[in-house]
């Protein structure tokens, strides 16, 4: 009897011990989840946690996925989670267990705008139901670069449908596939676009890194109004192959992150020559860089096109730069830009007609829409889902462009690019400044699905047209809403822009309240 009692107690103690062990394991996972999803943000922080064995890549990926599942329904930032994300993370953990390092992005989860192709079961939709079955089974060049550097592809983000090139009255961040993306700081306000979900995802810490694409403002504007760092790279620096096109004259792929250092590191991974994108060239850009000049001559562009509150914040930013020992010079564009935006619109219409027809014609048999005219018809036939809030006047205009007028196109393209490049070059040369800055945009406006977007000021177009680097930094708030500061690089001088952006960012850390 006593032996039976001892045996029973021993078994019970063993059960309790096993339960406590499981609870401790669960507690460890919860701590790891909290650390990964709520505290770890930068690449350095994550890599430090890996090296200290405080978290695994699998735990990190699971933490982000759990966070996305919990918060994404309020924001519509993420369209799909990559089904192989945990498998990718396990492979990273296997390497770590062997003391191996996959690359500079070892175990770093990355979200991709849903116009960037990936292998596997996820479609690349550009936000359109016409591409809901567009499973390409192809990694875009930038995705190959990410994988080779050790990154984990975590999923696809929402976007303005067709990169905001469908309607003059569209609401940025809306797509038929993903619905309306909401600003990370106020769900009644707009996230800007077209890389809406990527910016909101970083602001909400759904991942440490996300990729966006830009034709004119589609990386920098969402980053600005959601308080994150972003880089629109120079033309030819990063390949666009495997990305649903808008305009090869201006399209760029660039990173968003929690720090300028991280954005810079990711860009160093993405860049490089790609035979499938003839604009690309070998780009010598080091991930780590040395700041050699501490006192800058900063050219400040006017802020009168932005909201009054943004103008006040800009004055504070300029004051902070002066307090940090820099010289601030008020400058303005002296070049006549009267034809610039009309020319830009024509080039974009021409490019989109030509390039989206080529893209659609080469999709798999699962995609039934094979041309721009077929896309327009598809939207009409699916009006209840596709044209619930706004139409497709831009698609119709693009479809009407005469692609045989190549001389007109080439002359227009030469004129507008020469004009934009000269305007930037003259800002530097005529004012003898080290760097040119401006507000990126005003704070996020109220989302209006009836009337569309309500922009107040933008600094993206010159860089977008000239093909030069454009960096945006979180630089304070207006009524609790983030506002970014733009660094507009001179032609062929991205390295200087990164260096100067770092100096400016450091000046703001102690003097300008940053979004949290």
Describe the residue ranges of each PLM region.
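A short helix-breaking turn/cap at a secondary-structure junction
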Residues: 232-317, 324, 508-516
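Gly/Ser-rich catalytic/binding loops embedded in alpha/beta enzyme cores
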Residues: 38-216, 234, 295, 319, ...
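N-terminal signal peptide c-region/cleavage motif recognized by signal peptidases
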Residues: 32-34
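Acidic-enriched catalytic cores of C-N bond-cleaving enzymes acting on peptides and small amides
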Residues: 260-282, 305-338, 349-381
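Sec-dependent signal peptide recognition
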Residues: 20-26
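Glycine-rich, small-residue loops and helix-cap segments
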Residues: 53, 107, 396-516
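Flexible glycine/proline-enriched surface loops and loop-helix/loop-strand junctions
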Residues: 126-128, 182-187, 194, 243-252, ...
């Amino acid at each position: 009897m006593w032996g039976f009692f001892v045996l029973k107690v021993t078994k019970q103690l063993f059960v309790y011990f096993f339960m406590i062990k499981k609870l401790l394991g669960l507690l460890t996972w919860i701590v790891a989840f909290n650390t990964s999803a709520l505290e770890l943000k930068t690449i350095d922080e994550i890599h430090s946690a890996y090296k200290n064995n405080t978290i695994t890549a699998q735990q990190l990926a699971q933490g982000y996925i759990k966070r996305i599942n919990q918060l994404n329904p309020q924001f519509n930032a993420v369209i799909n989670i990559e089904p192989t994300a945990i498998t990718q993370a396990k492979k990273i953990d296997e390497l770590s267990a062997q003391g191996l390092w996959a690359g500079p992005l070892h175990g770093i989860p990355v979200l991709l705008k849903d116009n960037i192709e990936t292998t596997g079961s996820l479609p690349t939709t550009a936000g359109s139901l016409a591409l809901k079955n567009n499973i390409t089974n192809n990694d875009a060049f930038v995705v190959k670069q990410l994988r080779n550097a050790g990154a984990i592809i975590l999923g696809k983000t929402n976007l303005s449908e067709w990169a905001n090139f469908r309607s003059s009255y569209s609401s940025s961040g809306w797509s038929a596939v993903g619905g309306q993306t909401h600003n990370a700081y106020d769900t009644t306000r707009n996230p800007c676009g077209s890389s809406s979900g990527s910016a909101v995802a970083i602001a909400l810490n759904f991942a440490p890194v996300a990729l966006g694409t830009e034709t004119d403002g589609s990386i920098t504007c969402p980053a600005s109004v959601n308080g994150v760092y972003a880089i629109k790279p120079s033309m030819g620096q990063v390949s666009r192959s495997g990305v649903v096109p808008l305009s090869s004259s201006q399209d760029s792929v660039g990173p968003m992150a929690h720090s300028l250092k991280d954005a810079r590191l990711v860009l160093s991974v993405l860049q490089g020559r790609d035979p499938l994108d003839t604009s690309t060239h070998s780009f010598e850009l080091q991930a780590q860089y040395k700041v050699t000049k501490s006192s800058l001559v900063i050219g400040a562009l006017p802020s009168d096109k932005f909201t009054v509150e943004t103008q006040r914040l800009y004055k504070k930013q300029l004051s902070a730069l002066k307090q940090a020992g820099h010289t601030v010079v008020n400058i303005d564009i002296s070049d006549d830009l009267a034809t610039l935006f009309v020319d830009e619109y024509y080039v974009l219409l021409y490019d989109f007609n030509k390039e989206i027809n080529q893209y659609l014609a080469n999709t798999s048999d699962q995609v039934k829409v094979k041309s721009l005219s077929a896309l327009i018809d598809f939207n009409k036939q699916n009006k209840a889902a596709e044209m619930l809030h706004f139409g497709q006047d831009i698609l119709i205009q693009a479809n009407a462009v005469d692609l045989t007028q190549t001389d007109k196109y080439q002359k227009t393209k030469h004129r507008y690019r020469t004009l934009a490049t000269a305007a930037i070059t003259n800002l530097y040369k005529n004012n003898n400044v080290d760097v040119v800055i401006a507000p990126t945009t005003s704070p996020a406006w109220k989302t209006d699905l009836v009337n569309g977007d309500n922009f107040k000021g933008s600094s993206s177009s010159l860089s977008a047209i000239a093909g030069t680097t454009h960096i945006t930094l979180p630089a304070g708030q207006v009524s609790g809403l983030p506002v970014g500061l733009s660094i507009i690089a001179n032609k062929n001088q991205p390295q200087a822009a990164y260096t100067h952006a770092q100096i400016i960012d450091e000046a703001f850390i102690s003097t300008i309240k940053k979004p949290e």
